[in-house]
Amino acid sequence: MDISIISDKNNPLLYRREIKFTVSFDAATPSIKDVKMKLVAVLNADKKVLVVDTLDQIFGKLEAEGYAKIYNDEKAMATIETKSVLEKNKIEEEAAEAEVAEE
């Protein structure tokens, strides 16, 4: 999976960076969680404040266009983003921590 950044714009009014990107892949369209983790690595961002808003498949190509936001802090993200978008981007950290605690 390769990610290329189309635009990276700072939006100080909403305390965030807005990123438009394309994702190239070999098989099925990657999940939002997979794209989010790849963006965290590419942009060197904190996964707690990065939100993948949209990920749209381009018809007939093994590519998808996406829109992500990186907030300055979690408080701004919780105030501005809708609950559905936050749930869609939630990473199951609690489940991973529970597995470690059981061992």
From Swiss-Prot:
Annotated GO MF terms: structural constituent of ribosome
GO biological processes: translation
Gene Ontology, cellular component aspect: ribonucleoprotein complex; ribosome
Keyword Ribonucleoprotein found: yes
One Pfam short name: Ribosomal_S24e
Keywords: Ribonucleoprotein, Ribosomal protein
Keyword set includes Ribosomal protein: yes
Family listed: Belongs to the eukaryotic ribosomal protein eS24 family.
Stated name of the protein: Small ribosomal subunit protein eS24
Species the sequence originates in: Methanococcus maripaludis (strain C6 / ATCC BAA-1332)
Underlying gene: rps24e
